[in-house]
């Protein structure tokens, strides 16, 4: 259950970020800010700050004295423990040094109202022992007098150095007043100096003005310190006990943002107003310095304008001169070009007339023309060099005026020699080009040579590539619809001349197969013969001469004995080859049914004649075993035919 607290109860108040702090519950005075519901106004000992806290954050002092009443390093905590025991009626109405320092920032009108309020609060508070009350009254009156003196002295001076705060001793209340007043017044030069700096543009003038103002402010601040040191000595002697206690509290005081003390609201306004009065001496110095600077600036600007006008005039004159010179050069070039054009026309006419003549005299004429051109170029060069010299002399005469003009002239000077050199080179090239051009006849001669050289550059096809190419040509030449016999014969002739190896033939077995088929091509006898010849050539190259002779003997015997069979087979093979040649699966349309019957009759007659001759010559061929072995075959075929 939360404890019911009353005004005047001593407690330990817990605030976030702080230890349990010795405090007292205050009574809400008339006209004061009312606390929110369920919260009590709290006065913190040691720091003399106030806040509103809920009862749950408050703990009775007597009950929790042993728990929370231990000394702590926090500033103001130990002082608070001492105050809650020895001076529980302490209040922010008895002003410590911090209050006087805050009041010193406020203008005179508000400070007098504040002092009246403090007197009323002291009258309303419970009475302290007589000695302490009398001492506090005396001290309050003395402090009010000191405040008025300070305002009178500090009115003319707006700047204070920070050395005064470090030189003062922190034991007396007067020293704390001076520290606070100095610290507040240190902000004034920071506000005033930017205004002066905005006016001053030159760096040298700025430094001088600032040095003078600082020296004036230092001398004034030292005088004020002496007066202030004399005045608080009497007040410190009259009340030693209270001044010592008051001087200790501001030293150990911590600024607590979460415990807002009752501070005067118009502090920033007071500082803003205080910054307004600027010392008359400084203002007069600054005004005079600004006037001087403005005069100096005006003079400087006038000089700059004059210099710029001069430069502009000089530059314009230079540009005019250069333009005139360029125009003259352009006119000279045009004249030279016109002369050269006339010469080139005459030369071209002469060259056209001399096309039929040998080229040797042409070379001599071109060499003479080139010599003339070189002479002309040499004559042009000294003219250009003289122009350059004239330009340099003019530029030197102008460059004596000012250093800044030299830079401009250098930029104008530099591109000129390079441009002139380029122009002369271009002239030489233009002069040489028409002389060195070849005639149309020479060009026509060179064209076929170039084409031949390009052809030579191409790689020669290998044997395998040529073989494949010829194979494809043969196939296309022997089409069923439109056979090209001549092309086929040429391709076969070329194929027979190729140095084919066994490896190439193993890779390209299709070539051998087509040759075998073409040997049985009935449409044209020449193609058959040529194919057989090429086939035998390739076979002889691969197998050798012995195998060739043996094959010839075997072929003769086979043709003698297997005549009818071979003819039938060749007929069938020819038909198959013609049907399947080049992927054409159409049968030959030339052969008719009647032709086939006639061929069969002719074959039967041939077979009968051969059989008769064989029976008559049987006795002669008994010694040859090859003939004996092949005798029964024709008999069997004859029986089949019958």
Swiss-Prot record:
Pfam families: LEDGF, PWWP. GO terms for molecular function: histone H3K27me3 reader activity; histone H3K9me2/3 reader activity. It is found in: Nucleus; Cytoplasm. Residues 294-342, 595-624 form a coiled coil. Its main location: nucleus. CDD domains: PWWP_HDGFL2. Residues 87-452, 542-642 are annotated as: Disordered. GO terms for biological process: chromatin remodeling; DNA recombination; DNA repair; muscle organ development; positive regulation of double-strand break repair via homologous recombination. SMART domains: PWWP. Residues 90-104, 231-248 have a biased composition (Low complexity). Residues 107-117, 205-230, 289-352, 372-381, 416-449, 553-565, 607-621 have a biased composition (Basic and acidic residues). Gene3D superfamilies: 2.30.30.140, Conserved domain common to transcription factors TFIIS, elongin A, CRSP70. Residues 7-64 form the PWWP domain. One of its GO terms (cellular component) is nucleus. PROSITE patterns: PWWP (PS50812). InterPro entries: HIVI-bd_sf, LEDGF_IBD, PWWP_dom, TFIIS/LEDGF_dom_sf. Keywords: Coiled coil, Cytoplasm, DNA damage, DNA recombination, DNA repair, Myogenesis, Nucleus. May act as a regulator of myogenesis. Promotes the repair of DNA double-strand breaks (DSBs) through the homologous recombination pathway by facilitating the recruitment of the DNA endonuclease RBBP8 to the DSBs. Belongs to the HDGF family. This is Hepatoma-derived growth factor-related protein 2.
